[in-house]
Amino acid sequence: MRAVYILAMACAATLQASSSALPSTKDLNSQVESLVPSDITDSAHVGGVRLLRVEDKEEETEEERGFGGALADGLKKLNPAKAAKKAKEKSCEN
């Protein structure tokens, strides 16, 4: 029974804290209006065409992401057929 009360209090505290963290809609609208200057909106349209994104074609660099390159190189070195052949040659020498 105590667990139910503790859970209810935790939910109530979470909801109260999350609702007090949000600004009121009246304040939010005034902040949005003050943050949109006309020069930003005009710069999105050039020559009657809306610019969504600018790409730099000069530098096309490819990045290695994650462990893909190192993992592939390591897997190339791990060839079980070569390892078995080397082990067989080593055992024949002894």
Swiss-Prot record:
Induction: Expression is induced during host plant infection.
RxLR-dEER, short sequence motif: residues: 50-65
Cellular component per GO, a single term: host cell cytoplasm
UniProt keywords, alphabetically: Host cytoplasm, Host nucleus, Secreted, Signal, Virulence
Classification via Pfam families: RXLR (PF16810)
Compartments reported by the entry: Secreted; Host cytoplasm; Host nucleus
InterPro entries (UniProt xref): RXLR
Coiled-coil positions: none
Signal peptide residue numbers: 1-21
Principal subcellular localisation of the protein: secreted
Role description: Effector that enhances P.infestans colonization of Nicotiana benthamiana leaves.
Family membership: Belongs to the RxLR effector family.
Domains (record comment): The RxLR-dEER motif acts to carry the protein into the host cell cytoplasm through binding to cell surface phosphatidylinositol-3-phosphate.
Name of the protein described by the UniProt record: RxLR effector protein PITG_15972
Lineage: Eukaryota, Sar, Stramenopiles, Oomycota, Peronosporales
